[in-house]
Amino acid sequence: VPKSRRDVHKNLYSEDALGNGETFIKYIQENAKDYYSAIDFAKGYKIKALTKNTKGDLVDVKMDGQDNSRGNTIFSVLPEDKNLIMNQFEIVKSLEQNFEYPKGDEVVLFTAKNNEIDKNVLKALGYSENDKVKYEDVLGKEFSIVDNNNYYTKVENRFVPATVDEKMYNAGTKVKIVAIAKAKDSFTAPQFTLGYTKKLQDSLLSKEVSSDIVKEQEKDKS
């Protein structure tokens, strides 16, 4: 790829894009406050997760036909400013009383106003699309978020997903659903199903940065 084309894909948001030692993100935060009431920046990190279905079998948490080597679209990191989310959703059930927002390794399940979850998402969470799932069935459900070194195996010069087994599950970071939030109105559609904390994301990224697949990518800048 010609150098000029590679430069188009550089991360200009966290680099000195303005030429004065200031990143674009920092500039927006400090100089454009009059133009937004709240703002959040996403890293685009997609997690790889396993769970157990109703039969007790381990399954990859992914939509039918989704290539999980590209990451998971069911999980999404939540903004640190809870108002960005909770202005649109309300907690309808939680493991703890007076729950407001997830902390640490806690996960929240988001639904439409009528408590509906897409059947493909339901299957990805380990349930049959015909199951009638109650709040009590979902609360406390555990997932194992697997890091690169445990999820991928190297075959010749390529990294491919390894076989899902108990060893992979046990090696992952365990999280569980602690609350269910539904949309306050019928016009709000959840953009994701499971929301997790930025603190958890930062912890996961601190491991991934030194993983074998990332090291290989760093060596191959072409």
Describe these PLM feature segments:
Residues V1-S222:
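Basic-flanked hydrophobic alpha-helices used for secretion and membrane insertion
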